[in-house]
Swiss-Prot record:
Cross-referenced InterPro entries: Ribosomal_uS19, Ribosomal_uS19_bac-type, Ribosomal_uS19_CS, Ribosomal_uS19_SF
One BP term from GO: ribosomal small subunit assembly
SUPFAM superfamilies the record matches: Ribosomal protein S19
Membership in a protein family: Belongs to the universal ribosomal protein uS19 family.
Compositionally skewed regions (Basic and acidic residues) per UniProt: 9-28
Role played: Protein S19 forms a complex with S13 that binds strongly to the 16S ribosomal RNA.
A Pfam short name: Ribosomal_S19
PANTHER family found in the cross-reference section: RIBOSOMAL PROTEIN S19P FAMILY MEMBER, SMALL RIBOSOMAL SUBUNIT PROTEIN US19M
Keyword vocabulary terms for this entry: Ribonucleoprotein, Ribosomal protein, RNA-binding, rRNA-binding
Name listed for the protein in its UniProt record: Small ribosomal subunit protein uS19
Record-level GO cellular component terms: cytoplasm; small ribosomal subunit
């Protein structure tokens, strides 16, 4: 079920704080996060995030097309080895 529009997008406070500090300073260092549930907002465009997938952190560079999606969508948790070969 989709989130109500009147509530607005969910972003963890600690993650938003890090983005705001980098925007104020003008730096673009990678931000390491475990918050896969946070939604990508327009002020995150151009930043690089290291999103945890359960085993390691995968690098995600945020572009305009990613706004409105969640960080976890770009860091897959399962590896697909392919369908089994029929004998």
């Amino acid at each position: 079920m989709a989130r109500s529009l009147k509530k607005g997008p969910f972003v963890d406070h600690h993650l938003q704080k890090k983005v705001d500090v980098q925007n104020k300073e003008g730096t673009k260092k990678p931000i390491k996060t475990w918050s896969r549930r946070s939604m990508i907002t327009p002020d995150m465009v151009g930043h690089t995030f290291e999103v945890h997938n359960g085993r390691k952190h995968l690098t995600v560079f945020v572009t305009d097309n990613m706004v409105g999606h969640r960080l976890g969508e770009f860091s897959p948790t399962r590896t697909f080895k392919g369908h089994p070969i029929k004998k």
